[in-house]
Every structure is written in C-alpha cells, then in structure tokens.
Amino acid sequence: MLSTAAEEDPEGGSRETNNGGETTPDMQWRSWIIPIVVIANVVVFVVVMYYNDCPHKSHRCLAKFLGRFSFESFKSNPLLGPSSSTLEKMGALAWGKIVHKRQVWRLLTCMWLHAGVIHLLANMCCVAYIGVRLEQQFGFVRVGTIYLVSGFCGSILSCLFLEDAISVGASSALFGLLGAMLSELLINWTTYDNKGVAIVMLLVIVGVNLGLGTLPPVDNFAHIGGFFGGFLLGFLLLIHPQFEWEENQVSLMPGTIVKPKYNTCQLVLCIVASIVFVAGFTSGLVILFRGDSLNRYCKWCHKLSYSSKSQWT
C-alpha cells in the first residue's frame, strides 16, 4: 500500500520559462482512464464481497447488517474484506496455479483485487492523485499502458520470489506510475526548474513506501517489479521534445539553427531503457514458466518483503 504519496506533489518542479518569461504550456488532456480504473476496482471489490458471502460460511462476520457483503473477522482479515480462499478463486496471484495450471490471466487479474476496504481506499486514493495528473499531461494511452504493463511486471517479480503465498492489489501498478514519474524527470531534465527538490521528494516517497513494504503482510516484490517496470517505460513513453525545438516550430526565422527534436542523452536513455525492459520482461517470463525461483540465486532477497500465506500489495 502507498500511504504517503497523497501528502506532497512529488513532481512539483515547474517547467522552465521561454525567452518571453512565460511558461511553455503543455497540452492538457482530459483524464478519464484513471477514473475508470478506480471505478472498476470498486466494482470488482463489490462483486468479490458478494461472492464471498461471509454469513453463509462463517458465524464470525463483521458488519452483519450488510448481509452477504459483510466482512470476515479481524482474525481472518484485518483489512475489512473477503477470505483468502475467495480471493484465490477470484484471480489472486498464485505461483502454483500460474506455473502448473497455466492460469496466466492471474498476472493481470490480481491487480484488480483488494484484500479489504482499507486496502482498496489506500490504493485508489493514491492512484487517483498520481494518475490523474499524469494522464492530464501525457494522455490516456501512455498512462494506461504504463499502469497495466508495470502492474504485470510487478506480478511477474512477485511470482519469482513468493511461491507459497497469494497476492492481490493495485500497488504494483501504482509504483509503476511513481517509477514513470521519476524517469520522466530524468529524461526531461533540462525542461524543469526546481528539479533537485522534485527528485529528492519523489525518492523519499518511494523509499518510505518500499520500507513499509517489509512489514506484514505487504508484497514488496510486486512494488519493486512495478516500480522498475514503470521506470523503464517512462523513458520510452514520457519523453518531451527540447524547448528549443518547440520554439522553432512556432517561429522559424531565416538563418535559425534548427535543433533536433530530442537531444543525444534522451535518445541514449530511450535505447538503453528499451533493451533492459525487453530483456528483463522476457527473461522473467521464461524463468517463471520454467517453474524456477529467484530465491535460489539470491539468498538474502527474501528480506525485502514479508513472507506469509497472504500478501497485499
């Protein structure tokens, strides 16, 4: 869960001004994919609670006045939600079912499930706060792609380390958005002022939440996988043209030296990020479907995440 992102604007550095002293305006997109994501997560949670039907399976339900939507006991689920068995049936991340039964769809469905009301509210508030801003700046195609693909990356890494636990939650995709914000700052470094403050603030937010990921029962591997997936995708999808190039498109005077759309550093970062992403994504899938575990090669990595039967991201 991401609990601190809504307190600050981590990318608060403003765009540098042009020669006229005015900030170069970015196209403002209407945000609609992130609101749909939030609504979809809420609807899925309601469906899961309906299917869970606690009163017909247990006498220790909370908020019994809700009928079949009542919650499992605090002992069973302290986050006010369904049972682990219900989440597993509805598509939670489960290594055995993905590897042995080839239920690959779980790598995507798990990010739409939540362990409880508290889990859902924490994730969706942060997704809305971060995602709407990114979508307004870069559009629904790029932000939606980062959200889904980085969530998928988080699921892969989680499976490679957690073989005996189920995992649910949208935090892997949420960390993907944070990773994309960081790479966007780096690849468009020359277009921001106050960049030092912005990048330090963002790194502090990510660091604090990764630290919280070592507490039970959070799946920190999903956070890490989502963050690095979004970080690499941000270099590819959130690149801005140089301001000099944009200004030349507005008023190209005779004799003006035309600058390239992207500088050399931006192009190098794009190439390196694409190679690393393809290599990491492909190798992760290959290792997963071979039934292998990265714990065999990294003896200390288990310390990065709390390990239990159920994991919430």
UniProtKB/Swiss-Prot annotation:
Gene3D superfamilies: Rhomboid-like (1.20.1540.10)
Species in which this protein is naturally found: Arabidopsis thaliana (Mouse-ear cress)
Gene name linked to the record: RBL7
Biased composition range(s): Polar residues: 15-24
Family to which the UniProt record says this protein belongs: Belongs to the peptidase S54 family.
Protein name: RHOMBOID-like protein 7
EC class name: hydrolase
Localisation: Membrane
Function statement: Probable rhomboid-type serine protease that catalyzes intramembrane proteolysis. May function in embryo development.
Keyword Membrane belongs to the record: yes
Comp. bias intervals (Acidic residues): 1-11
GO molecular function: serine-type endopeptidase activity
Gene Ontology CC entries for this record: membrane
